[in-house]
From Swiss-Prot:
<comment type="similarity">
    <text>Belongs to the glutamate--cysteine ligase type 2 family. YbdK subfamily.</text>
</comment>
<dbReference type="InterPro" id="IPR011793">
    <property type="entry name" value="YbdK"/>
</dbReference>
<dbReference type="InterPro" id="IPR014746">
    <property type="entry name" value="Gln_synth/guanido_kin_cat_dom"/>
</dbReference>
<dbReference type="InterPro" id="IPR006336">
    <property type="entry name" value="GCS2"/>
</dbReference>
<keyword id="KW-0436">Ligase</keyword>
<protein>
    <recommendedName>
        <fullName>Glutamate--cysteine ligase</fullName>
        <ecNumber>6.3.2.2</ecNumber>
    </recommendedName>
</protein>
<dbReference type="GO" id="GO:0042398">
    <property type="term" value="P:modified amino acid biosynthetic process"/>
</dbReference>
<dbReference type="GO" id="GO:0005524">
    <property type="term" value="F:ATP binding"/>
</dbReference>
<dbReference type="InterPro" id="IPR050141">
    <property type="entry name" value="GCL_type2/YbdK_subfam"/>
</dbReference>
<keyword id="KW-0067">ATP-binding</keyword>
<dbReference type="Pfam" id="PF04107">
    <property type="entry name" value="GCS2"/>
</dbReference>
<comment type="function">
    <text>Catalyzes the synthesis of gamma-glutamylcysteine (gamma-GC), the main low-molecular-weight thiol compound instead of glutathione in halophilic archaea.</text>
</comment>
<keyword id="KW-0547">Nucleotide-binding</keyword>
<dbReference type="GO" id="GO:0004357">
    <property type="term" value="F:glutamate-cysteine ligase activity"/>
</dbReference>
Length: 362
């Protein structure tokens, strides 16, 4: 039983970006393609050992190599995306990104045959059978295991901010859910998801991992799918909240924000600051507001006593941390509203086309 280790947390500030995409046909609709792209054909060099399928054969995941600094993230992300788009096009597929694909109907799509996913389908049943979600996961290296747990605890309040900004999944199984991120609700139906409780230290977190595996609740620690978690194999804190994004600039904005948060919180930990100890129920309320209202959300502030418009929180965070990307994301049309506008004004073909991940060689 591999539970990772305290020793894995041995570096600070490194980055890793994992993206889940939809494999689509010539009309931009999800189609089974991961067998061809992952198993049957050798991927380009940048994707070797960094390409995998997900639960459905229409969902594929990429991972960047470990990135040494934020300044190198742009090139690393571009290299992986370029390779994926080229690989897909070579074999007659396209690539699209969103939290949920508006044309995906889960009953009409094929599940992967990988034993791990088949075991999940058997154990979890309906919630996993319909899980056509795609997200963005960001890893930031932390050089101490107890620090990583403390940072993950504190990051919980910031997760609804990221979710509200990233929300671009209003449609699920062929209808408008009325939500901005239906992905968040679909995924939250699985066990071991959503907003985690706080852990006292790494020992308590690892004890929890061990209990979940040894009692058969999960097959491996990777099935703890919380919105944020210490990753005891990679030695990182992993943020798993954002919807998948077609625009690489939006991805980089969330990477910039996540790294800045981890650096800020790490410094606070080293200064001996006490944790906020937020109630999970109130953090869940913020998450609900984020997935329901997106850019129009009003979230409970850090004191959990007052509602503040998302725009004010974003501006405050940009000034506090010296970041700018999330301001650009907020000031742009939200992904969910863009999808609704396109479907109403131009139809499903235009909407599907807008989710295409493309590569401009210039």
């Amino acid at each position: 039983m591999d539970l990772g280790s305290r020793e894995a947390f041995d570096r600070t500030g490194t980055l890793g970006i994992e993206e889940e995409f939809f494999v689509v046909d010539e009309y931009g609709r999800p189609t089974a393609g991961t067998d061809e792209l992952v198993y049957e054909n050798e991927p380009p060099e940048p994707l070797k050992d960094r390409l995998d399928h997900e639960l459905f054969k229409c969902v594929i995941e990429t991972q960047t190599p470990t990135i040494g600094s934020l300044s190198a993230a742009d090139d690393a992300l571009a290299e992986v995306r370029k390779a994926l788009v080229s690989h897909a096009e070579t074999h007659g597929f396209g690539i699209a990104a969103a939290g949920l694909h508006p044309a995906a109907k889960w009953r009409e799509l094929d599940h992967a045959e990988k034993p791990r996913y088949r075991a999940q389908l058997d154990r979890i049943q309906y919630p996993q059978h319909r899980n056509t979600t795609a997200g963005l996961h960001i890893h930031v290296g932390v050089d101490d295991a107890d620090k990583a747990v403390w940072v993950a605890n504190e990051l919980r309040w910031y997760m609804p901010v990221m979710l509200a900004l990233s929300a671009n999944s209003p449609y699920w199984n062929g209808f408008d859910t009325g939500l901005q991120s239906a992905r968040a609700k679909i995924f939250e139906a699985l066990p071991n998801t959503g907003m985690p409780t706080a852990f006292e230290d790494f020992e308590s977190f690892q004890s929890f991992e061990r209990t979940m595996v040894e009692t058969g609740s999960i097959n491996d620690r990777g099935e703890l799918w919380y919105d944020v978690r210490p990753h005891s194999e990679h030695g990182t804190v992993e943020v798993r909240t954002p919807d998948g994004q077609a625009d690489p600039d939006h991805v980089l904005a969330f990477v910039e924000y996540t790294q800045a948060l981890v650096e800020d919180l790490s410094a606070r930990y080293e200064d001996g600051e006490s944790g906020a100890n937020h109630r999970r129920e109130l953090l869940d309320e913020n998450k609900w507001r984020a997935l329901r209202h997106g850019h129009d959300a009003e979230l409970l502030d850090r004191s959990l006593e007052e509602s503040v418009p998302l725009g004010e929180l974003v501006e405050s965070e940009c000034q506090r941390l010296g970041v700018s990307g999330i301001r650009d994301v907020y000031e742009a049309e939200s992904g969910a509203e863009k999808q609704r506008r396109l479907l109403e004004s131009e139809g499903m073909d235009a909407l599907c086309g807008s989710l295409s991940v493309e590569w401009d060689s210039s």
